[in-house]
């Protein structure tokens, strides 16, 4: 009995490394350090690549003239390339009416279905031209509305690397890989993804990240493996819904 419980916990405790804001202009020095570390530990992260980066904050970083070859090389290693918005420029405010009630500015929220499809199609076209297959998406600042999900589905993307929950789950023909915390945390039970913005890191942050990966290496899994963990049904939906409300209340009490 105890052995069965331990096995169940072990099989259902894992983390997907999700890296945000991967673009031509970024902190390339730290990216190279992360790449070497991933190779050493045989970790296959998911990289959120911005297909047409126009974010003024990101454009301040050094530019790689060989960016798309770098992306293809990462992809050949088995790293998952995910579409992270289109141009990473915010044009609307959500007033916490976005799907996950994060609030703040958004690249997609509030736009018409046709406008959102145009952005998504343009992004996907860029990846096709660069010979990179896209199976997943996550929006800048976690902000979506129902049009975003409909546009993604109509463009053939059903995997969203975002949301609340203890487990990856399927809802209305979409798969959601939960992303709960702003720093690397390994829960004692459950499967989620990280949120890593290495452009804002200092050397100390990288060293802490390295320690975290070495400590939890065996529990870090690839995108393909996490897709096999997607669950559905009322029980899973209820757990994730309850967790969502607990997190929202906790965040509200901090302000």
Q: How would you describe each model-predicted region?
A:
Residues 137, 194:
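Divalent metal-coordination and catalytic microenvironments
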Residues 1-136, 143-189, 201-255:
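Catalytic alpha-helical scaffold of carbohydrate-active enzymes acting on polysaccharides/glycoconjugates
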């Amino acid at each position: 009995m105890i052995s069965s419980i331990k096995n169940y916990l072990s099989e259902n405790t894992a983390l997907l490394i999700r890296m945000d804001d991967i673009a031509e202009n970024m902190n390339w020095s730290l990216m190279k350090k992360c790449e070497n570390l991933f190779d050493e530990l045989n970790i296959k992260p998911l990289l959120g690549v911005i297909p047409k980066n126009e974010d003024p904050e990101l454009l301040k970083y050094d530019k790689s003239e060989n960016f798309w070859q770098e992306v293809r090389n990462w992809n050949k290693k088995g790293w998952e390339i995910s579409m992270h918005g289109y141009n990473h420029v915010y044009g609307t405010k959500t007033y916490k009416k976005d799907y996950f009630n994060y609030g703040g500015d958004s690249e997609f929220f509030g736009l018409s279905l046709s406008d959102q499809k145009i952005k998504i199609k343009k992004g996907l076209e860029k990846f096709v031209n660069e010979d990179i297959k896209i199976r997943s998406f996550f929006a800048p600042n976690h902000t979506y509305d129902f049009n975003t999900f409909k546009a993604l589905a109509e463009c053939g993307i059903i995997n969203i690397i975002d949301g609340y929950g203890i487990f990856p789950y399927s809802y209305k023909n979409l798969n959601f890989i939960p992303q709960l915390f702003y720093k690397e945390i390994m829960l004692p039970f459950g499967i989620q993804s990280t949120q890593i913005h290495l452009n804002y890191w200092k050397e100390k942050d990288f060293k802490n990240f390295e320690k975290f990966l070495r400590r939890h290496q065996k529990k870090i899994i690839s995108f393909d493996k996490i897709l096999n963990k997607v669950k559905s049904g009322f029980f899973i939906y209820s757990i994730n819904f309850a967790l969502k409300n607990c997190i929202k209340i906790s965040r509200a009490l901090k302000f």
